[in-house]
Amino acid sequence: MSQATPTPPTALPDESLPPVQPPNAGFLVQLFVIPGLIVLVMVLVWTLIKWLPQMGNDAETNVKALEGSGANRWQAAVNLANLLRGDTTGELKRNEELAGRLAAKLHQEISDARTGEDAQLLRVYLATALGEFHVDAGLPVLVEAINTEELADRKPSLRAAAVRSVAVLSSNLKKVTGEPVTDSAAVAAVIEASRESDSLLRTTAAFALGEIGGSAADDRLRVLLDDFAHPYARYNAATALARRGEPAVVDVLAELLTTDEPPETSDKDTTDEQVAQRMRLVTSGLDAVLALAKANPSADLDSIILVLEKLTQDESREIRKRAQVVLRELQGRKSAA
């Protein structure tokens, strides 16, 4: 029986707002509520995985399936990414051989440059799976994918998926080794991606730079603070730098907190979807404020306190409650100073 091809994953704010705590490998599942940053409009919607047909629940079965010549091989890549993400023992995540096989397959698929939808989905989900590992065997091919030329209207984007996977991989590596991705080629590729005009790619790259860290990444994030043409990239830069304690982000965070309408929406977005996006933006901004206060106790947040006081009267109950918590925290810190 033929399988219906699901709508390709999209990116939203927060999930694009990958969260005030650095997002972990599972942040892709939530897209835009990603704990730690603000990844607006930039995350794969993993909810589609819940209904995708399963091709076997073990890694080897799925690897053989995607290495074969059958149709819908991308489903095997989805299954592998799902298995890796749910691997609580770490056995799969630490499997260098498995990572190497997936990396080799992605390299082959990039070289073949097939244009069919199945081939495109396979490349995207292979890249996604490689980000779930706790070993960096897939990093070189992710860099290759980021540097690959693709049609501007190609969706889902392999380049964006690869950038996103570098972010997740960096978060994973930092968790298990204490060090994020520092490979110069990877950092350079993500920085170049942050200069692209495509909003999703640029926004995703800004998020990834926050996960990578390092002086070169931070320098680029500071430039993106003035990227008014791409608000979500700008917000991701601000939330990343907030976690580093940079007071220069205060004005951008204040702007984020006073968002009435999401700056980047689609004509297809319903009113409810826009309200939800606005809530994710504001709550992510609130998390970033707390991160800044924690990282830099001496930062002048008086202008933020004024904004928070207004948010305690917001029509959204969730925003009101969260703003009250953050306001009390800042006022307490100020009193103790």
Language-model region placement:
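Hydrophilic extracytoplasmic domains
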Residues: D302-A337
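N-terminal intrinsically disordered, acidic low-complexity segments at the extreme N-terminus
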Residues: M1-V20
